[in-house]
């Protein structure tokens, strides 16, 4: 398209320099030999931890391996003129305290809330000249019921009750997200005083129990049962169940029929944006703009952030206490504490001298489940996708469904199950599960006029292909072509609109973003790796066996997603420990 070409030329190089980088180069750009605290990795959790520590009066520096901050919450211009949220792509789970306490709106964060938020087109022949059916869900419950009634009037009546049921569970779990887990080590091995102090960590559990009350057994089932079993108890129509089940498997090497998948379902419905519970939205300028806002808040209070500065090793004193880090260029930076936003595996198996860690602890970290089904494909297109189930208007302007998470190959939970089964044999799914998002439908700054960016979160793809083969360029392109063929069936003309793409298989996600196995949560969000077992039992309160070394990333409680809770909670624990030194 001509209009797209003109806009593309204007867009190249038009991105302004982030506020945090301007402030840092003006006042705090020189590396000092010593800080109170060092944060390894400028992912969103690391930036949050640094921002809080600096506010507490702890002089903090952040070292980032890449040329850009944000970790997986990053905006990158892979195709000239098109700005992609290259890894994470939606916002909802960010804790409201972080939004307000770090004054992120003041530091440039702008959000586009999505309503409606979910669109599931059917792959079927329209009858009587009508278009194929689809399921469109948003915040209007009456309209939701009308949509669901196309498939089941019984389900339409049950849906508000289901939403209320899940909202109550999310409300109960809320206090657990904003505090360290129960300190089992203090209970088991601490002094009497430490045991008494650790009793305070039981308060969030008590609060959760009070909210759930007599319905606790039903809610326990949600956390432990297969998501399909939970959904079958509420609904009968497959399009609705399959749409809801996508939240149970997103980013997880599981399927709706595996026990424990119900928890991941909850993990993705317990967020809020600007006071609207369960809302999801796009960040103006892409997810990197969120990281820039956190960094701006941090540097405004004195945090120093250094990009392209890889931490090679955690330094330990002869007395067995952290005393700083060594950078890849050989520079030594001393500090009282080190917080790692890297995964538990990188932190404890690569950066930390093994002689300072108990063998049992190292073995547990090495055994963490990091399997990932995800291949993320970022696509630049020169026109809006045109779905058979919801045709575009003549002006080609975005319609309500274009702002949604668009669920493809999602008419039936058995399709999700079959996609999972394929990958057990080392094969990418024949009919992959696809979540398609078009953030430029609400944020035109992401692409040249007339063009759009499309995010494809797809599964299931194995880390290693059948026969022990590694992914190569041909395999990547073959899989991406398969995904595009699937989209073409729902939206003819999609393949012809593509002007560029960026394919990230599980090994690519690991290489680029440091996600072990390509796992977006650092390690699986299964019940055996949650709360006081995250990352491992007895070391779930952000502390490690090595004094002065802390975990503050998604591998710590409460887990993955762009939440920031691990960074905030870890900062409070570190500040408490520093005061007692």
From Swiss-Prot:
GO annotation (BP), single: mitochondrion organization
EC annotation from Swiss-Prot or TrEMBL: 1.-.-.-
Entry keyword GTP-binding: no
Annotated localization: Mitochondrion matrix
This protein's GO CC annotations: mitochondrial matrix
Molecular function per GO: oxidoreductase activity
Residues the record lists as binding FAD: 38-71
Pfam families membership: Amino_oxidase
Enzyme class (EC, first level): oxidoreductase
Domain of life the protein comes from: Eukaryota
Assigned keywords, A-Z: FAD, Flavoprotein, Mitochondrion, Oxidoreductase
SUPFAM superfamilies assigned to the protein according to its UniProt record, in alphabetical order: FAD/NAD(P)-binding domain
InterPro entries: Amino_oxidase, FAD/NAD-bd_sf
Quaternary structure annotation from Swiss-Prot or TrEMBL: Interacts with COX5B; this interaction may contribute to localize PYROXD2 to the inner face of the inner mitochondrial membrane.
Task of the protein: Probable oxidoreductase that may play a role as regulator of mitochondrial function.
Family membership noted in the UniProt record: Belongs to the carotenoid/retinoid oxidoreductase family.
Stated name of the protein: Pyridine nucleotide-disulfide oxidoreductase domain-containing protein 2
Organism listed in the record: Bos taurus
